[in-house]
Amino acid sequence: MAQKPKIDPHVGRLGYLQALVTEFQETESQDAKEQVLANLANFAYDPGNYQYLRQLQVLDLFLDSLSEENETLIKFAIGGLCNLCADKANKEHVLQAGGLPLIIGCLSSPDEETVLSAVTTLMYLSSPGSRSHPELTSLPVVQCMLRFSISASTRLRNLAQIFLEDFCSPSQVAEAHSQQAHSALGIPLPKTEAPQQP
């Protein structure tokens, strides 16, 4: 059985999170970076950690990681942002930091979990008060959701349909349908497990 890492009980939650951030910034190992980012994304589930994660600029660390070439880092980073963006202060930070293009870029990931987290994050960011961010429901995003709404993946299909129904106007959906009919271009669907042929 693996042992838990030894943590100084006097360090506390903030100290532990700071140690994770420092390890992420200082390590050269991609495996270590992936593990640390996964841990930070898991800590982002707990609203009790939000203040510490903001203080340690973990939201910016997640946003920066969306530009990495390592798909695993991107998956954990968008997962962490997804966990954090239900909170108003975190949502505002992501929007003000210019995170939307990075999150929208995750829609073209070949990894389904990354795409699911990106769609959910966009839904959190699209909640009331986000009218000043029209890129959330821009034509390319709506076209992408239309493509996802016919995905073989039930989770992706359902999430895209919710996005289209709850966050897009009927005229936006109609325009996207019309434009898609005239174009073969689009964001590719993420890879899903194909049924095995006998």
From Swiss-Prot:
Residues modified as Phosphoserine: S169
Keywords: mRNA processing, mRNA splicing, Phosphoprotein, Repeat, Spliceosome
Keyword Electron transport: no
One biological process term in Gene Ontology: mRNA processing
GO cellular component: spliceosomal complex
Keyword Membrane: no
SUPFAM superfamilies: ARM repeat (SSF48371)
InterPro entries: ARM-like, ARM-type_fold, Armadillo, ARMC7
ARM repeats: 57-99, 100-140
Function as written in the Swiss-Prot or TrEMBL entry: As a component of the minor spliceosome, involved in the splicing of U12-type introns in pre-mRNAs.
Subunit field text: Component of the minor spliceosome. Within this complex, interacts with RBM48.
Name of the protein this chain belongs to: Armadillo repeat-containing protein 7
Organism encoding this protein: Mus musculus
Lineage: Eukaryota, Metazoa, Chordata, Craniata, Vertebrata
